[in-house]
Regions:
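Short, glycine/acidic-rich beta->alpha junctions
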Residues: 24, 64-66
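Beta-strand-rich recognition domains
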Residues: 1-50, 54, 74-148
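Exposed aromatic-hydrophobic patches
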Residues: 68-74
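Short beta-strand segments within Ig-like beta-sandwich modules, predominantly Fibronectin type-III
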Residues: 58-64
């Protein structure tokens, strides 16, 4: 979307490229196999709000398309579950609630020492639930991405 920063345009995922599903939380979880124990950093952004869990425990939230960091310390090797819930707000009164006017999405990268081990684009093929966050926003219609 033309108003999103590069991180969102690269990594944002949402269940539809035509329906903004305003006001309705969209949830998923993904199994991430950790090969190296350590302190991980989850970089996140959302349009409009998202919350995150790690192995069922709340670890943070985002309400901005600008990235913020969530530290996940002392992660052990083996499979872990990242849970995600994203809600796209209803647009201002008088604004049509269309994808072009009101896109939604959640974006993340998980890294250890600067090496990315998982991103929200992995949701396409690796969800642990019958979730619907399997679509990346670069396929969106009704808007144009511009670079400066």
């Amino acid at each position: 979307h033309q108003l999103w920063p590069a991180f969102m345009n690269t990594y944002a995922a949402f269940p539809s490229n035509t329906d903004p599903t305003s006001g309705s939380a969209q949830t998923t979880s993904i199994s991430i196999n950790i090969e190296t124990a350590g302190n991980y950093v989850l970089e996140v952004a959302a349009d409009n709000t998202a919350s995150f869990t790690w192995d069922g425990a709340s670890i943070g939230s985002s309400s901005s398309t600008t990235t913020s960091s969530i530290n996940i310390n002392t992660v052990s090797t083996g499979p872990h579950t990242l849970g995600i819930s994203v809600t796209n707000n209803t647009p201002a009164s008088g604004t049509a609630d269309t994808w072009a006017n009101n896109p939604g999405g959640v974006a993340y990268t998980l890294s250890l020492g600067g090496t990315v081990v998982s991103t929200s684009l992995d949701l396409v093929s690796n969800t642990t639930t019958s979730s619907n966050l399997v679509w990346h926003t670069r396929l969106g219609t009704g808007y144009a991405v511009t670079t400066t």
